[in-house]
Amino acid sequence: GGNIALFFMTVQKDFSDKNGNYDILLKHVADRQLRRIIDVGAWWGPWSLFWQSHAEKLEIFEPNKKILPMLAQNISKFNNCTLHKTALGESKGTVSMAYDTHSGTNHVTDFKGDTEINTLDSYSFDNVDVIKIDVEGYEIPVLKGAKHTIITNQPIIQIEGNSSGQRYGISKKQIMELLTSWGMTRIEKKW
């Protein structure tokens, strides 16, 4: 598994990309034909809009019912985008979510509710070259529900992280340890 690449980055509230995050990503995928990219926690679609021109297929996951109309409108002109109106986690079911439409800091609050949750593995995606995850601290359940997809496809993984994992008792160190145990290699050290 040493050929699996892992990319970490910090949350970016300014989408002008003055920190060069798009360039950092592109240097790692420039020589690859990107077949499928998965955007987990898409919000209104800033990364989806960036990625759609770099992939044959873009699978977009966003559970926030308040932001979904804007996201759907933003990607509507692109034939390679599929919107999945669900949260992702370690198992299937329903959850309650707290939504902040302005900041994009939506997160799971309870494991009963009206928001559908699935595992990424349940979709049986193949040819996955990049997985972007921005789930406000819920990274470990999302990753555990994507273990087969990750190990089978060996994608670059972009995790947008801050200290929000503390609400679930999850640290960045635990995320790195989990991915390292699956043979992942860290290729950027911005996190």
Q: Residue ranges of each PLM-predicted region?
A:
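Phosphate/nucleotide-binding beta-alpha loop and adjacent structural elements of enzyme active sites
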Residues: 1-191
